[in-house]
Every structure is written in C-alpha cells, then in structure tokens.
C-alpha cells in the first residue's frame, strides 16, 4: 500500500507543478524516468509514460525494468502486473483534495516550487518552456526519488477511455484493504 500511496503523492505533486502556470490546466502527457535510491544508496531505475486528466485521473504505464500499469481515479487504485498475471485493486481511505493540495505549492526565490503533503516535502522544477521537468522527494521509508519528465504535453485532449482498465481474461484479481 505504501507504493500505491507514493504513486498518488507523485501525481499530486506533478499536478501542483502544473497548477503554478494557471488554473486552466486540464491534462498532462509525458514520458518519464524515475530513479529511486534506497537508504543504502542502491538506485532502481524505472521508465514509462504517464497521462493525467484533472481533477483526479492518472495512468502510469511502466515499460522498464518490468511492465506495469497503474490506474488511479479519485481514491481507487488498480495495479496490473502482466508478468504476474495479477491485478491489485484498492481504495485509499483518504482521497486527495486536489484543489487544496495544488494551491499549497509555493514558489521559492530559486524558481523551484515546494510543498509538503503527508509530511513529505516535494521540490518541483520547471524548464525554460515553463513545463514540468523534474520532481524530487524523500519518502517516509527514506527512499529518495527523482522523477524526470520528457516530451511533456499540456492540455491536450485525452479520452476518459484511457483511464478505464479492463482486466485480461484469466488474471488473478486481488482486493487490498483500504489505507
């Protein structure tokens, strides 16, 4: 569940970055590279594609090192791991109040944006084109994560159908308890 919570917080932080450029933000699409360094200094690198649509829909499509899809809509989280032929379904007890969280990001003199969500501080960076470039944070387990975004598209049309998961026939569906 900590992993699912981390995905929600990263997406929330990403939305916070985008909000700083205006209230008309409706969607984001980007390729990403995520590097998580544990307390022992051992890095794990992930890459994939993310799409998000306000107020609370997101799909993480991990390509490497293993394929994984994560769908989020409000407080519902679905994680599909094709290699395991398994779908995990859960509901988070606390769904994010996106407007309040988005408004909490504060611009610092160095041009970065900082916010704190559930005791975790997020540092948000933008590029010269005023698009989100990077998010850095250390989670409650001491894992330092850097999320680098590339090929960022803002406010493009994204069909709601892209956020609907239909489980393949024969996969195991595991219901996880709410957190």
UniProtKB/Swiss-Prot annotation:
Localization terms from the record? Periplasm
One of the Pfam families matching this protein, by short name: LolA
What residue range is the signal peptide? Answer: 1-22
Write out the entry's keywords from A to Z: Chaperone, Periplasm, Protein transport, Signal, Transport
**InterPro entries for this protein:** LolA/LolB/LppX (IPR029046), OM_lipoprot_carrier_LolA-like (IPR004564), OM_lipoprot_carrier_LolA_Pbac (IPR018323)
GO biological processes = lipoprotein transport
Q: What is its main location?
A: periplasm
Gene Ontology, cellular component aspect: periplasmic space
Function, please? Participates in the translocation of lipoproteins from the inner membrane to the outer membrane. Only forms a complex with a lipoprotein if the residue after the N-terminal Cys is not an aspartate (The Asp acts as a targeting signal to indicate that the lipoprotein should stay in the inner membrane).
Matches recorded under PANTHER family: OUTER-MEMBRANE LIPOPROTEIN CARRIER PROTEIN
How the protein assembles, per its UniProt entry?
Monomer.
* Similarity field: Belongs to the LolA family.
Protein name listed in UniProt:
Outer-membrane lipoprotein carrier protein
Q: What lineage does the source organism belong to? A: Bacteria, Pseudomonadati, Campylobacterota, Epsilonproteobacteria, Campylobacterales
């Amino acid at each position: 569940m900590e992993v699912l919570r981390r995905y929600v917080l990263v997406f929330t932080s990403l939305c916070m970055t985008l909000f700083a450029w205006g209230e008309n933000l409706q969607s984001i699409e980007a390729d990403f590279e995520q590097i998580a360094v544990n307390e022992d200094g051992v890095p794990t690198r992930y890459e994939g594609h993310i799409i998000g649509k306000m107020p609370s829909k997101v799909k993480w499509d991990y390509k490497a090192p293993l394929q994984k899809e994560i769908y989020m809509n409000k407080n519902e989280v679905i994680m599909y791991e094709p290699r395991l032929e398994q779908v995990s379904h859960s509901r988070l007890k606390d769904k994010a109040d996106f407007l309040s969280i988005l408004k909490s990001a504060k611009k610092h003199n160095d041009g970065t944006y900082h916010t704190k969500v559930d005791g975790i501080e997020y540092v948000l960076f933008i590029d010269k084109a005023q698009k989100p470039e990077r998010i850095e944070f250390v989670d409650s387990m001491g894992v330092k994560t850097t999320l680098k975004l590339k090929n960022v598209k803002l406010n493009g049309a994204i069909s709601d159908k892209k956020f609907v998961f239909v489980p393949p026939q024969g996969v195991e569906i595991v219901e996880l308890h709410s957190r």
